[in-house]
């Protein structure tokens, strides 16, 4: 399984460039979107060249999702744990954003390796924030417990007004994704890809990876979920996560893989579309010589 990078490459490069040229005092004001769902805004003024403001707008949550003060539950604690005193959370955030972080670049670690690691973590703010509730649940799984008030089906946002679902238990966490796509070609390609994905994992005998299944209809874990949340046109994918999948350093990898699963599938669908188009162009080219 190809893993998408957990950090924003553009944000990391911008941070590195800023740190290396901090005395030049160049003003910055950039907006961009990644994964088609997370919007970023960075600001640096000439008046305060050491202060880097990073604002993040998250996907609009569905009605089933738990947001606290505009953020997924556990996000504030996750931000403080990840960045410590080097980052200040502005309250309220900039208009139109869920979160604004104030970073004093003159106070970040002086050691080159530590500084780079810190900037990579800042550039991974999407993972830190959106992955926070998933991390809380999976950390409890690692200790074979269930997080307080989480002994029921939990909805987590991963796309605008779309959720994936977790059913936490002491010995496992079942994760279910209703897969939706807008384009009719994407639906066909995604359905085919997901069936092949599940079958390949089964036949390869990947005993160390989470068990995975796909179905046209909602699995029993989603009983009682609203009809809107179950409107999946590419089926449902389920993973069963056991404590061994979240032990030690495996936790970060599992959190990121689950947080970006839909983006991972979308990436492969788009790649297949490109290959199909290139194949059609090649076929037409060959036909022109007949």
What are these regions (language model features)?
Residues 1-73, 98-150:
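Short Lys/Arg-enriched alpha/beta "domain-start" segment
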Residues 24, 31, 88, 153-155, ...:
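Residue-level detector of beta-strand structural context in well-folded domains
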Residues 44-47, 91, 165-172:
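Amphipathic N-proximal alpha-helical interface segments
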Residues 61-96, 102, 132-160, 170-240:
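Short, internal acidic amphipathic alpha-helical interface segments
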Residues 66-90, 104-130, 196, 200-201, ...:
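Ampiphathic alpha-helical segments that act as solvent-exposed interaction surfaces
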Residues 235-251:
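Low-complexity, intrinsically disordered regions in eukaryotic regulatory proteins
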Residues 273-290:
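Short, highly charged C-terminal tails/helix-capping segments
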